[in-house]
Every structure is written in C-alpha cells, then in structure tokens.
C-alpha cells in the first residue's frame, strides 16, 4: 500500500522501532514483573490506567522524534522533499498513515493488559475499550498542539501531563460508582470523537504542509 510505503520512507526507522515494537514489549515486561511481585493484586482496573498512562506518554513524546515541530514555520526538517514532484504527496500519505497507525498500536499495547485481566478477573471489554478510545483520542488530538513545540523539555512536561490525565481518567471513569452506568455512553462519545480528531488533525497538518511549500515558492 502506497500510504504505508511513504510512511516508512518519511519516518525515522528508530521512531517506528521504538513506538511500534519496543513499547509493546516493554509494557509486557513491566506487567510480567508486577505480576511476579504482587500476583493477583495487580490485575485490576488500575493496570488499565497504568497501561493507558504509559502508552499516552510514549505517544506524545515519541512523535517529537518522528515528526517534530512540523507545524512551525522553518522547522519542517524535510525540505529535501520539496525537490521532488511527489514529495508533498509522500508527506501527506505519511501523516495520514501515522494517524491511522496510532489507534491500532494503542489497541495492541492495551491488549497486553486485557488478556491477563480477562483470565484472572473477568470480562475486560469495558476497561479495554475505554482505555483504547481515551488514549487514542489524546494521542491524535494532542498533535494539534505538540507539533508546534520545539523544546524537548516542554515536550517532556506535556508527556507527563498526558500520562497523568490518561491514567487518572481511565481509573476514575471505571471505578466511580456515579460514572460506571455512563461508561458505554462515554465510550460512544469517544468513538465518535476519534474519527473527527483524525479528520481535523489531518486537515491541520495538510494545511501546514501546503503553507510550507508556498513559503518555499
């Protein structure tokens, strides 16, 4: 598929390796270590909160190494693409592929939490869907802010804020007696917000790419 080829051509190999391969492995190892220490006590909704927090922080921080502050004028860092007649299309395809990969990558990571939860506690569908949808929304919508940030220190702070917000939200929504009956409604709203976020972010990124080409001219 052309979009995937362009995504691989534009993004750094280390970025793909870390976000698409190493992060799920690291999350799995952490879960195994926690299980070895505290056994059954860890397989609760708290682990979904931890998983969501961990993945959200990596999604936010990892993008800095993948696309950087591409929304800032002069910081695209891919001016070599402007020498090619297909460069603009390649960058657009890569940006779109990145948006589509995020929910899939997040779902795979959260499945590592859902499997032991399902075996030892019960049906993991509700906390799994909530954590995936919430984390994916944060990952996608945050790009409209983080891709303006050039400082790694600021990105680190934003990553930690996202970490806390995601983890706390998943845990609170799931265990709060007042919100439990609205969980499916919340998930439905998040399911609608996700494609909207992908569309809005795609349009935003495309406009910035177009503007960078006009500035070059």
PLM-predicted stretches and their roles:
Residues 1-76, 92-217:
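Hydrophobic alpha-helical transmembrane segments of membrane proteins
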Residues 81-89:
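Short helix-to-coil transition segments within interhelical loops
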């Amino acid at each position: 598929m052309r979009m995937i080829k362009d995504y691989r051509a534009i993004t750094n190999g280390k970025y793909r390796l870390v976000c698409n391969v190493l992060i799920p492995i690291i999350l799995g190892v952490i879960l195994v270590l926690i299980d070895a220490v505290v056994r059954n006590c860890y397989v609760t909704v708290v682990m979904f909160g931890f998983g969501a927090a961990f993945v959200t922080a990596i999604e936010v921080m990892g993008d800095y190494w993948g696309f950087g502050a591409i929304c800032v004028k002069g910081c695209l860092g891919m001016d070599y693409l402007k020498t090619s007649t297909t460069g603009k299309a390649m960058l657009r395809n890569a940006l779109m592929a990145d948006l589509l990969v995020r929910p899939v990558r997040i779902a795979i990571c959260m499945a590592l939490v859902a499997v032991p939860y399902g075996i030892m506690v019960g049906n993991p569908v509700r906390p799994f869907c909530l954590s995936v949808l919430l984390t994916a929304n944060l990952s996608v919508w945050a790009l409209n802010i983080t891709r303006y940030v050039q400082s790694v220190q600021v990105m680190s702070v934003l990553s930690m804020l996202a970490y806390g917000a995601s983890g706390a939200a998943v845990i609170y929504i799931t265990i709060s007696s007042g919100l439990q009956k609205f969980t499916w409604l919340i998930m439905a709203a998040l399911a609608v917000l996700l494609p909207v976020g992908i569309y809005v972010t795609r349009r935003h990124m495309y406009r910035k790419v177009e503007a960078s080409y006009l500035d070059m001219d």
